Regions:
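Carbohydrate-associated surface elements
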Residues: 187, 209
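Aromatic "clamp/platform" in nucleotide-sugar-dependent glycosyltransferases that forms part
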Residues: 323
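A short, well-ordered alpha-helix in the C-terminal region of glycosyltransferases
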Residues: 384-399, 405-411
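Nucleotide-activated donor-binding/catalytic signature segment of Leloir-type glycosyltransferases, i.e.
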Residues: 268-277, 282-309
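Short alpha-helical donor nucleotide-sugar binding micro-motif in glycosyltransferases
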Residues: 310-315
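Conserved acidic donor-binding segment of nucleotide-sugar-dependent glycosyltransferases
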Residues: 355-356, 360-367, 376-382
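Conserved donor-binding/catalytic core segment of Leloir-type glycosyltransferases
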Residues: 182, 232-252, 258-261
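Short hydrophobic beta-strand element within catalytic cores of glycosyltransferases
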Residues: 340-343
Length: 426
């Protein structure tokens, strides 16, 4: 019988955790045995190690606001699981000292490694720094993960952890031919294949699964009732924006959204502006205060997927001003809930939002164009928005639903299991 060790820092905190949990549930639904190994209840010692790592990584100064990780330490149950080498080990987000870079050489043969960001083939940064003032994002910059990290690097002060950690990862992984890596988007597939660490590796496209039975549209009656309960009228134009940390997370484009809304005020009348209501989820605080001159309701962190789906469905449009997304979970969930999306045409979002069909995409990171896209969405007729919304759900069903992703996932599991069995025979 196939047994999978599913390893992730968390199964509840963040998009990577939710994706990992969904992959585990796909296995369980098909009768595959799964051991979930995570740090959700790991205790004080694990927390202490993460604090040490957090302090040490701050010794590198590189002006990149993205999360940085050293991964000096391992969570003991993860390393202990390597004793069960006949089981399939599927690694998800292994940062926050879930698996140490010094234990990478112990990863069992024929394991699966799912990348939820760029950390594995970069230094200590989870994404290459994106310059919002560069219209093409980071694509035209000198990329260290392709050209190699240098000990002396302009712009880095203090300890150059990126150089050291990249060297350790490269030594441990670049020659491994038995690990299968999966990535959730074509953008990440292209970048991983160009990286020095993974350029010779077996890398597959495996998008995050979306539960279309949970993320689905409300009926017209349910939608009106939900909006009424939240204090919104039928004539209000609801714009939803979601991110861990809310609009304060720089990678999620809070600054770009603020600039876009400031532009939007000059593109519409005061009467139309008063109809627009913002809903922000994902931040810790709940409040009702203006954001860039627009009425705004911050609803906090939402843990119930059904409630989140209802929130998406109640909105007229979802805005995703992210600078970079490995996949675009919010975009896919919104579309599955029949809510069209406005976003920059960047990174993993390009796989999900099709300009003019499932939403509007604009050139990165043109906030005036973003404002115009919101305006265009606002002035679409109700039927035009509904048509776009239906196309969006159909696209998610056809490309990211459980049935589609599970078929590819089980094919990979069976392939890896066959290789393990062949190794046993040898």
């Amino acid at each position: 019988m196939v047994k999978v060790k599913l390893i992730s820092f968390s199964l509840s905190k963040g998009g990577a955790a939710i994706a990992a949990k969904k992959f585990g549930h796909l296995l369980l639904k098909d009768g595959v045995g799964v051991d979930f190994i995570n740090q959700d209840n790991s205790g004080r010692w694990s927390f202490f190690k993460r604090v040490i790592s957090f302090i040490l990584v701050k010794m590198q100064f590189d002006n990149n606001p993205i999360k940085h990780s050293l991964n000096f330490f391992s969570y003991k149950p993860v390393v202990d699981s390597f004793n069960y080498a006949n089981d399939i080990h599927h690694f998800h987000w292994i940062n926050n000292d879930t698996l140490s870079v010094f234990d990478f050489d112990k990863i069992p043969q024929n394991s699966i490694f799912t990348l939820h960001d760029e950390w594995l083939y970069c230094g200590v940064e989870h994404y290459v720094k994106v310059d919002p003032d560069c219209k093409n994002g980071s694509e035209e910059l000198d990329l260290d993960f392709i050209n190699g990290y240098k000990f002396f690097k302009k712009g880095i002060k203090g300890v150059n952890w990126s150089f050291y950690i990249w060297k350790i990862k490269k030594k441990a992984l670049s020659k491994r031919k038995d690990i299968v890596y999966t990535v959730p988007s074509l953008w990440m597939l292209d970048r991983a294949k160009k990286s020095q660490i993974l350029k010779d590796a077996d890398i597959r496209l495996l998008p995050n699964p979306i539960d279309i039975d949970v993320f689905k549209p409300l009926s017209a009656l349910e939608r009106n009732e939900f909006r009424y309960k939240m204090g919104f009228s039928e004539s209000d134009f609801l714009i939803i924006f979601g991110a861990i940390g809310g609009n304060k997370n720089p990678i999620k484009g809070g600054k770009q959204l603020e600039e876009s809304l400031n532009h939007l005020k000059s593109l519409i009348s005061d009467t139309d502006r008063q109809r627009i209501r913002l809903i922000i989820f994902g931040s810790a605080e709940k409040s009702s205060e203006a954001f860039s001159g627009f009425s705004c309701s911050r609803v906090g962190h939402i843990t119930d997927p059904t409630e989140l789906s209802a929130l998406y469905s109640a909105a007229d449009c979802a805005v995703i001003p992210s600078l970079v997304e490995s996949f675009g979970q919010v975009a896919a969930e919104a579309l599955a809930s029949e809510t069209p999306v406005v976003c920059f045409e960047t990174s993993g979002l390009k796989d999900i939002v099709i300009n003019g069909r499932t939403g509007f995409t604009v050139e990165p990171f043109d906030t005036y164009a973003f404002a115009n896209a919101i305006k265009d969405m606002f002035f679409l007729s109700t039927e035009e928005r509904k048509s776009m919304a239906r196309l969006g759900r159909n696209f998610v069903v056809a490309n990211f639903s459980y049935s589609i992703i599970s078929e590819n996932y089980f094919s990979l599991i069976n392939e890896v299991n066959s290789k393990k069995l062949n190794n046993l025979v040898k």
